[in-house]
Design a protein with these regions (language model features):
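Basic, Lys/Arg-enriched alpha-helical interface segments
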Residues: 1-67, 76-79, 87-111
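Conserved catalytic cores of phosphodiester-cleaving nucleases, focusing on short active-site segments
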Residues: 83
Length: 111
């Protein structure tokens, strides 16, 4: 994919502000990984994220300050949608974070 063919990133809800609140290292890593997705590549550390909507993926970031997640979907032709960005504080993803991402996915799907 050439630079002209990069997909735009669209931020759902407060996802951009949430990402900008990450510590510097985690924020830069998230930006780099989203750049990979824009180029049509896979992020370095990701997995499918079930229960939100078809095609939802999770970028996994770990730094000295904690564990961070960026939930996104790249299956739509027009853009990559960042659904939710958050710091993970427990072994499993909090239900509130899942509900935020699911509501944003549903809003995007209805467009």
């Amino acid at each position: 994919m050439s630079a002209q063919q990069q997909k735009d990133i669209k931020w759902a809800g407060s996802s951009k502000e949430d990402l900008l609140s990450f510590p510097r290292e985690a924020r830069h890593e998230a930006g780099f990984q989203l750049g990979q997705v824009q180029l049509g590549l896979e992020p370095d550390n990701w997995k499918p994220f079930n229960g939100i909507g078809a095609g939802t993926k999770e970028i996994r970031i770990r730094d000295k300050d904690g564990i961070y997640r960026v939930l996104y979907v790249a299956k739509f032709e027009e853009a990559i949608y960042v659904l939710h960005c958050f710091q993970k504080k427990t072994e499993s993803t909090a239900q509130a974070d899942k509900e935020i991402a699911k509501a944003r996915y549903q809003a995007i799907s209805k467009r």
